[in-house]
From Swiss-Prot:
Superkingdom of the source species: Eukaryota
Protein family membership: Belongs to the SPC24 family.
Task performed by this protein: Acts as a component of the essential kinetochore-associated NDC80 complex, which is required for chromosome segregation and spindle checkpoint activity.
Alphabetical GO biological process terms: cell division; sister chromatid biorientation
Gene: SPC24
Species for this entry: Kluyveromyces lactis (strain ATCC 8585 / CBS 2359 / DSM 70799 / NBRC 1267 / NRRL Y-1140 / WM37) (Yeast)
Main location: nucleus
Record's keyword terms, sorted: Cell cycle, Cell division, Centromere, Chromosome, Coiled coil, Kinetochore, Mitosis, Nucleus
Cellular localization per UniProt: Nucleus; Chromosome, Centromere, Kinetochore
Name of the protein this chain belongs to: Probable kinetochore protein SPC24
Complex formation: Component of the NDC80 complex, which consists of NDC80, NUF2, SPC24 and SPC25.
Coiled coil stretches, renumbered: 24-124
Gene Ontology CC terms: Ndc80 complex; nucleus
Length: 189
């Protein structure tokens, strides 16, 4: 207890336990480190705040773009639906299928008609050759050959000979020469 009663001794003993200069130096260094850490933390906080602002700005721009795209998509969807409703696509598809069937039927009908014409021509040719064999084998004269050639020429020009008049078959069968003329049609050629 004597130590407690002697304050000077107590101070000396306490001083001997601590190195005050070293502790003061350590405290100054700790304060300096704390200031540097505080400054570094403030810089990092400022950097992070700026980065957050940039990211929030980018996020807001992206959200605006997304909203615009959603709105555009909805408008296009409604426009497509309107066009589909106006066009009535299923009915158009049915109409197109029906037209294709009709075209195929017409094609078949035309093909059958062509086959009938070919068969009829073959029969007529066979009948003509049979008739030619049955007719007396008289030599065909030069005038007859000329007349046949003229008739073939008229036919190739879509012109027909009817009651001694040339008829233009391309224009509603009207006469090529006046009906009042009494000259021979063969003379016109």
């Amino acid at each position: 207890m004597s130590r407690l009663n002697d304050p000077v001794e107590l101070l000396q003993q306490t001083r001997s336990n601590f190195i005050i200069e070293s502790d003061v130096s350590n405290i100054k260094e700790i304060k300096s480190n704390m200031r540097q850490l505080t400054k570094l933390m403030a810089e990092k906080q400022t950097h992070h705040n700026e980065l957050m602002k940039q990211l929030q700005s980018q996020l807001q721009r992206q959200q605006t773009k997304v909203q615009a795209l959603k709105k555009n998509f909805q408008e296009q969807t409604s426009q497509v639906k309107r066009v589909e409703d106006e066009l009535n696509i299923p009915k158009l598809q049915q109409d197109i299928d029906k037209l294709v069937q009709e075209i195929n039927q017409l094609r078949d009908t035309i093909q059958e008609g062509i086959q009938k014409v070919v068969e009829t021509q073959k029969q007529l040719l066979n009948d003509d050759t049979d008739a030619a064999h049955t007719i007396d084998e008289e030599p065909i004269g030069k005038d007859d050959k000329i007349r046949v050639l003229k008739l073939k020429l008229f036919h190739s020009l879509d012109v027909a000979l009817y009651n001694d008049q040339l008829l233009d078959l391309r224009n509603e069968a009207r006469p090529l020469s006046s009906s009042s003329s009494s000259h021979n049609i063969w003379d016109e050629l």
